[in-house]
Amino acid sequence: MTQLPGLLDTEAIRKDFPILDRQVHDGHKLVYLDNAATSQKPRQVLDALSEYYERYNANVHRGVHVLAEEATALYEGARDKVAEFINAPSRDEVIFTKNASESLNLVANMLGWADDPYRVDHETEIVITEMEHHSNIVPWQLLAQRTGAKLRWFGLTDDGRLDLSNIDEVITEKTKVVSFVLVSNILGTQNPVEAIVRRAQEVGALVCIDASQAAPHMPLDVQALQADFVAFTGHKMCGPTGIGVLWGRQELLEDLPPFLGGGEMIETVSMHSSTYAPAPHKFEAGTPPVAQAVGLGAAIDYLNSIGMDKILAHEHALTEYAVKRLLEVPDLRIIGPTTAEERGAAISFTLGDIHPHDVGQVLDEQGIAVRVGHHCARPVCLRYGIPATTRASFYLYSTPAEIDALVDGLEHVRNFFG
């Protein structure tokens, strides 16, 4: 068994994840390497969800009966846990959404409806990057189309890093908002937040960070990031699907208009006009994802019990080992950084002229689950002249043995298409 420095006790951790005991395709042990798409869920989260529905299920904020009060306490307690997890100055800065995509769309639409000085219009510019997930491209394209704003972006270097050589020309006095990913879901690249934020602040632009591939894997401190908005999702960090988070600075949330209207987000309503509740409820129209928020709170408890610093060290050791092993495979090309420095635990690659979908299918027959395609980042594939990639991604329960199984599986793929 391969021993690496900094590894967690994966034997103990894996006992918390029932699905990892599954066998697939005629008895092959499941090797789950698709964690950038979604993580598996520990029993502690599954139990929290079951307990909520069995004992506390009710609508929140709208009743004086015991179930409503208990459900509200659990829901708002989850908000407290998120605020502490990301070191938010105030719990009222934590908005629950259904996923990171909705969080980013919320920011774009708030700015589209805002009054000065936040309004995005035909005289302003929006800056993103070429490595973004479609969820951090399309909302800004829609906003630019609707307002006439100009959309600009940073390109990529050949080794999968952001090209910031022209940062002063891209982020200018016309820039209203800069939105970028903290860790790329396709390249694995960890971006230089400080340099981008510093330039944005120099010109008075707002900063929005997509932390979907960071929040599950490393300590996340929104105050240290010095961003104005930070978005992430729950299902990639051991939580259930259907729950996302948008953190925003209090003064911005007070000034910016709501996007969705409905129950709970109002203060008063007449047939002539409405006034709105303070944040975060101003941005949480209708019945919220109560059970999902409770599940996210349980996931945060679980991650905290292990320690985000330890999870980061574990994944760094795995990534370093995986890069080394993958580069030993003939004809394999890593798309993105080829070292473990300043990168996350998602590695995309091509294998000669074998289409990634064929690679993924043959690996699946061996019980190895990877992701194939554009990974909702088609501009990256266009930049590197490839139709798609195969992506392996790791988490706190991943092991060196699973990386070895992947490498052995790729040899089988090469022989199969030999």
Swiss-Prot record:
Function: Catalyzes the removal of elemental sulfur and selenium atoms from L-cysteine, L-cystine, L-selenocysteine, and L-selenocystine to produce L-alanine.
Catalytic residues of the enzyme: C376 (cysteine persulfide intermediate)
One GO-annotated biological process of the protein: biosynthetic process
Protein name: Probable cysteine desulfurase
Molecular function GO terms recorded: cysteine desulfurase activity; pyridoxal phosphate binding
Cofactor dependency: pyridoxal 5'-phosphate
Underlying gene: csd
Family: Belongs to the class-V pyridoxal-phosphate-dependent aminotransferase family. Csd subfamily.
Keywords annotated in UniProt: Pyridoxal phosphate, Transferase
Span of the signal peptide: none
